[in-house]
Amino acid sequence: MKTALFTLLSVLLSGSALATPYKVDMGHSAVLFKVKHFNVGYTFGSFKSFKGSFEEGASVELTVDASSVDSNVEKRDSHLKGPDFFNVKQFPEITFKGSKWEGDTVTGALSFHGVTKEVSLKVEKVGAGADPWGNQRVGYYGELTIKRSDFGVSYGVKEGSASDELTLIISLEGVQKKG
């Protein structure tokens, strides 16, 4: 299946001259989602393949391969990749291009399923420090709830099989290689 890219964050701020670039450590990061199922429980999923980088307090770029979606049910994963949900053949990329990171809020344009909307992501700095190899690391966590129907994805909403609200859960650990 054609690779679909999910660029979740690309944030530019003033004062970035002192920003330090970090590469997202995929082995210690996660991009997850949850959606209510029949309004009685949640269905969770994740994306197994992504890459990115960020300059703390300045910019972030995250690209997620949407075809790597994994909900622990192969048949459902095939449906998620199809036209009712991600439609990876027609809309190969989902992007977020931020324009502002103030305090604990990152704001920018989320483009998904051919629609672009401004959204705000509340982030928490989890921690920062050196690893045993002398590299600097920093971690951020955030959740963003969107309405799927705002992006033209409304399969199951009317019937109640899948809620309109979808929450993205993003946990990124960045590493700055020494030297």
Predicted segments — roles?
Residues 1-4:
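Positively charged n-region of N-terminal signal peptides that target proteins for export
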Residues 18-179:
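Low-complexity, acidic/polar, glycine-enriched regions of mature
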Residues 14-16:
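N-terminal signal peptide c-region/cleavage motif recognized by signal peptidases
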